[in-house]
Structures are given as structure tokens and as C-alpha cells.
């Protein structure tokens, strides 16, 4: 499943686009062979390792021979950051940045499905909480993510303590995004009620666009076979059979534009993407009305400009 050759090829293609600028690899902590994939990413030329879907407590050890590689955890609470910082400090490292992801993001969430809409888990409440914890350990940047749509959202979240922002769903709706045309069409045509929460074999709730896959899910589907053994919580397909789909197969199908069998992740605001635009136009839309200090922050190297997901 986790091919070094594939990782190297992905990075070669990414380098053609970003040149010598920082290139990050986003690696789920929940995958099997997590340590090997971190190793592969570094060998392939990653400047930054980003990790969510769990607490990557062992990450400093995995990069100890590569002090120039930045390590960036994704958290959904100040408590999670405290645990990470305490463990990493003992290993001689601290985060080079932290991504604070709220429950309006696309894909896997950091809290239980029944807790997603509680006030205490909303981005505007967890950013100050994470900042308070961050200040105890240093001044590494806080990158806010999850449901950020426009310049007003950027200003508000930075006033609450974020140093930068991360957007994903809006960039799917750009000409330059390498998502399939089918994926883009599904996003552009999605209505508000089409953005739904699904149970994932990863063990976390996920936010996706409702397609035929979601409509026809059958729990306890014993016909599902495990071919990749990709994530530990799934336990060789046991989790996939419980929820009714294989995460590896269905995400692969979405990448390849298979409308009926693909799992198309989207943030809560995905339905607001109603046409494709260029990345340049999107960036201009996001930063033009912002205050000067916010524009400067968005432009700094603290932003992870290019990310490979693995």
C-alpha cells in the first residue's frame, strides 16, 4: 500500500510546480506503517511533515536525524496540543507550527459525530484555547482551518489568535486543482443538504458530499474485502464492513472520477462553490479586503504553500 516509489513520483511532480519552496507531506497517523511513510516522505524531499488523525507522539524520534524537517501536528483542542508538546519537549523538539482544525472542515473530524456542533468545539472557541496552551511552550505559528471561506472569516479568526489560515475545499473549485473533473462537477452542483457526515473506517466521522455511494451504504456489509490494510483502526476490513465502504478504495475512486463509488470529501461550505475560478482569482478574493498585517501573514513562509496528502 505504502510505496516508496509512488511517494518519490508524487514529490517529483510537486517539485515541478513549487520549485525550491517548502513542500509538506500530510500523513494520517492512523495509517499502518506510519513511521515508514514519514521516512519515505523525508527521502522524497519533504520539508514539512503534517500529521492528524491521532496524536503523533513519536514524530520527533522519527525525524531526529533530520533537524531541518519541520513537524506540524493537527489538533482540535488545547488539551491535544498540551499532550503533544509535553511529549515532544522531552524528545528535544516542539512543533514548528500547529494546525487547529475545527469541525466544519472536510474529511475526517477530531471529535465524535454527536459533538461536532457543540459550541466548545467550534473553531472560534478552540483557537483561543490552543493559543493559550501554545503560549506556554513558545511562539510557533497557529494555522486555523475548517470552514474558513472568505476574507471576513480570515480576519475574524486571526483576531482570535491565529497566525495563518488553511483552506482546502475552496481550492478544489479551481481550474488548477488536480481533482478529477467529475469531483469538481459534484462539488459545484452540491446543495447545502448534500454536505453530510458519514461514519468512516478510520474511526472518526467524516464530512462528504452525498452521492450514490452514501445513499446506498449498507452497514455490516460482509462483501467488502480488504486489499490494502491501509489504516490500523479498520483492522483488515472489519471497520470497512461495519460502515459499509473501504476508505482506500472509495477515496481512490473519487480521485479517478468514479461518481457512483467515490467518496468525495468536502468542507461544510462546499455547497457555496458554484463555479470554477483560477487560483489567482481566489487568492485575490481572499486577501484584497484584508488589513495589511493579515495580507503580510498570509504571504509569509509560515504558510504551508504546497502539501502532498498520503
Question: Which stretches of residues belong to each language-model region?
Answer:
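Active-site entrance/lid segments in N-terminal catalytic domains of soluble metabolic enzymes
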Residues: 1-137
Amino acid at each position: 500500500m505504502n510505496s516508496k516509489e509512488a511517494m518519490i513520483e508524487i514529490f517529483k511532480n510537486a517539485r515541478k510546480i513549487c520549485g525550491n519552496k517548502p513542500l509538506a507531506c500530510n500523513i494520517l497517523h492512523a495509517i499502518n506503517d506510519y513511521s515508514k511513510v514519514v521516512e519515505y516522505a523525508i527521502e522524497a524531499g519533504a520539508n514539512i511533515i503534517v500529521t492528524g488523525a491521532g496524536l503523533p507522539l513519536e514524530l520527533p524520534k522519527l525525524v531526529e536525524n533530520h533537524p531541518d524537517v519541520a513537524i506540524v501536528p493537527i489538533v482540535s483542542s488545547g488539551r491535544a496540543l498540551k499532550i503533544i508538546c509535553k511529549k515532544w519537549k522531552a524528545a528535544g523538539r516542539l512543533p514548528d507550527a500547529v494546525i487547529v482544525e475545527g469541525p466544519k472542515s472536510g474529511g475526517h473530524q477530531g471529535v465524535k459525530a454527536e459533538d461536532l456542533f457543540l459550541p466548545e468545539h467550534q473553531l472560534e472557541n478552540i483557537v483561543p484555547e490552543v493559543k493559550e496552551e501554545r503560549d506556554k511552550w513558545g511562539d510557533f505559528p497557529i494555522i486555523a482551518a475548517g470552514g474558513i471561506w472568505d476574507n471576513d472569516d480570515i480576519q475574524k479568526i486571526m483576531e482570535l489568535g491565529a497566525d495563518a489560515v488553511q483552506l482546502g475545499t475552496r481550492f478544489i473549485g479551481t481550474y488548477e486543482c488536480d481533482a478529477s473533473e467529475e469531483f469538481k462537477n459534484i462539488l459545484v452542483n452540491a446543495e447545502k443538504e448534500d454536505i453530510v457526515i458519514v461514519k468512516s473506517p478510520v474511526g472518526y466521522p467524516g464530512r462528504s458530499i452525498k452521492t450514490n455511494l452514501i445513499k446506498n451504504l449498507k452497514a455490516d456489509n460482509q462483501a467488502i474485502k480488504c486489499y490494502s490494510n491501509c489504516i490500523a483502526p479498520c483492522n483488515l476490513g472489519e471497520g470497512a464492513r461495519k460502515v459499509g465502504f473501504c476508505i482506500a478504495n472509495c477515496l481512490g475512486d473519487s480521485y479517478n472520477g468514479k461518481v457512483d463509488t467515490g467518496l468525495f470529501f468536502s468542507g461544510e461550505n462546499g455547497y457555496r462553490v458554484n463555479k470554477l475560478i483560477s487560483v489567482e482569482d481566489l487568492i485575490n478574493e481572499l486577501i484584497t479586503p484584508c488589513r495589511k498585517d493579515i495580507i503580510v501573514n498570509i504571504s509569509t513562509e509560515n504558510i504551508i504553500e504546497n502539501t502532498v496528502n498520503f
